[in-house]
């Protein structure tokens, strides 16, 4: 009898395939949810990922778990961007660039977040908010230490400003308005006039 730990077999490749299938499902879901909203067809997502519906449901038993995975993936991307910006030469420009990315994230993910809030445990929302606030805090503190951001500004102030802009401009016809409003908010963030 061969011990279990030395048995040859395709166990590792299957786990690798399963991981790739999950990644493809999240990638496809991200695209389909962006195009069609959180109520998009799960069959369309499976088809775009190149897997069957059974594979989708083995990985994500319901729509909410798939929505949560997509939201976490998007937040990972947003927070990873903040981490990379921590090494940028200009703390001021790094903060502004990340806030622009956060505004885009908030505008694109409104329906996704709203759908999750209806059915998903509160802990997901709290975790997402904490991660975004931590990313904002790291960039804000760096700008404050360099003297380009107001010292009395809290990370939650920035997060609320950006979310407010995203909510206020959800149905505007002027596509440039969210960016203009963010630039006005950025002017209020700075302790001194920003370089052009």
Predicted regions and their residues:
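All-alpha amphipathic helical-bundle segments outside canonical DNA-binding/catalytic cores
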Residues: 124-128, 145-160, 172-177
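Short hydrophobic/aromatic patch on the recognition helix
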Residues: 50-60
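Short secondary-structure transition hinges
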Residues: 65, 97, 103-138, 164-171
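Alpha-helical DNA-contacting segments of helix-turn-helix folds
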Residues: 60, 67-74
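Basic, helix-initiating cap at the start of DNA-binding domains
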Residues: 1-48, 65
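Short, hydrophobic secondary-structure boundary micro-motifs
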Residues: 41, 111-117, 148, 152-153, ...
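Hydrophobic alpha-helical connector segments
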Residues: 69, 76, 80-107, 124
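C-terminal peripheral helix-coil segments that are non-catalytic and often amphipathic
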Residues: 1-9, 134-149, 171-196
């Amino acid at each position: 009898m061969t011990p279990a730990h030395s048995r040859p077999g395709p166990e590792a490749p299957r786990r690798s395939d399963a991981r790739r299938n999950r990644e493809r499902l999240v990638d496809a879901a991200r695209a389909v949810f962006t195009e069609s909203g959180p109520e998009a067809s799960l069959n369309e997502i499976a088809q775009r990922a190149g897997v069957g519906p059974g594979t989708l449901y083995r990985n994500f038993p319901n729509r909410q778990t798939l929505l949560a995975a997509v939201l976490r993936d998007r937040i990972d991307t947003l927070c990873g961007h903040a981490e990379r910006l921590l090494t940028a030469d200009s703390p001021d420009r790094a903060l502004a660039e990340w806030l622009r990315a956060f505004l885009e994230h908030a505008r694109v993910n409104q329906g996704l977040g709203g759908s999750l809030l209806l059915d998903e445990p509160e802990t997901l929302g709290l975790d997402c908010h904490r991660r975004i606030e931590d990313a904002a805090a790291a960039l804000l503190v760096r700008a404050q230490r360099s003297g380009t951001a107001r010292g009395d500004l809290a990370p939650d102030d920035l997060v609320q400003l950006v979310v407010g802009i995203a909510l206020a401009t959800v149905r505007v016809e002027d596509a440039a308005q969210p960016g203009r409003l963010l630039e006005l908010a950025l002017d209020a963030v700075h302790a001194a006039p920003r370089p052009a």
